[in-house]
């Protein structure tokens, strides 16, 4: 069952659209509510409808019994900017579950039933928010995540003339500030969690071997997680930074959430 909701967000100071897939009467045996729920964050330049209709989300939801909630990411990298009255991280990580649980009581409110994931920019946001709200999310799935957004401050050789530096400066406050930030910098956030004996939610990550945008960063991040002794299935397979690759990996991501 596919639903499109419109609700007022206090964190964003405006109305927002929320797309929801419920594993109910889709031609498969339907689980009994409350449903386990995956909050899934789109990547840069994508929106919720692209995620819902270009990837087999409805099929995966029906097969796994997991509801899927997708907001629009709006190229925000899920960062908070209270000075602009726009707190995209607070919305996606905290307010979105609160809104959907209130409007749809069929969604489970238990931590062990609540997951977060995303693609590219959304993968970065999912990891950041899983660390920021460890009492809310129990598992994380990251598809080709932009885990080192500071890498985007530099112009990419395969994208000549295209620089994301101005956007990253606006969102992250510049590379120096990002590097020192204990929330935006995922390595610092993980080190802080470990130092304070807080759990790093179990995570699954994948990236295509032909992904020149975030592939090297994903390899470095995986090595960092190994160094910190954080278990994380990391799937490297043929593919680029595109919907074709993510389509092929989505079932594995849901299997991880399902505990298989």
Indicate residue ranges for each PLM-predicted region.
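Non-catalytic cap/lid and distal C-terminal segments of serine-dependent acyl enzymes
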Residues: 1-260
């Amino acid at each position: 069952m596919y639903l499109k909701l419109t609700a007022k967000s206090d964190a964003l100071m405006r109305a927002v659209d929320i797309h929801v897939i419920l594993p109910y009467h889709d031609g498969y045996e339907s689980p009994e509510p409350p449903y386990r729920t995956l909050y899934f964050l789109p990547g840069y330049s994508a929106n919720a409808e692209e995620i819902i209709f270009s990837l087999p989300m409805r099929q995966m939801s029906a097969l796994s019994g997991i509801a899927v909630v997708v907001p629009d990411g709006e190229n925000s990298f899920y960062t908070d900017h209270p000075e602009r009255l726009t707190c995209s991280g607070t919305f996606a990580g905290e307010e979105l579950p609160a809104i959907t649980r209130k409007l749809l009581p069929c969604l489970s409110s238990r931590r062990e039933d609540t997951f977060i994931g995303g693609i590219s920019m959304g993968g970065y946001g999912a990891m950041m928010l899983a660390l920021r709200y460890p009492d809310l999310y129990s598992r994380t799935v990251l598809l080709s995540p932009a885990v080192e957004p500071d890498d985007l401050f530099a112009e990419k050789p395969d994208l000549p003339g295209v620089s994301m530096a101005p956007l990253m400066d606006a969102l992250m406050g510049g590379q120096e500030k990002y590097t020192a930030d204990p929330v935006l910098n995922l390595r610092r956030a993980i080190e802080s969690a470990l130092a304070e004996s807080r759990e790093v939610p179990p995570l699954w990550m994948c990236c295509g071997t032909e992904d020149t945008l975030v592939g090297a960063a994903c390899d470095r991040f995986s090595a960092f997680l190994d160094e910190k002794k954080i278990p994380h299935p990391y799937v490297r397979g043929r593919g680029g930074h595109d919907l074709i690759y993510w389509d092929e990996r989505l079932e594995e991501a849901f299997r991880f959430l399902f505990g298989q």
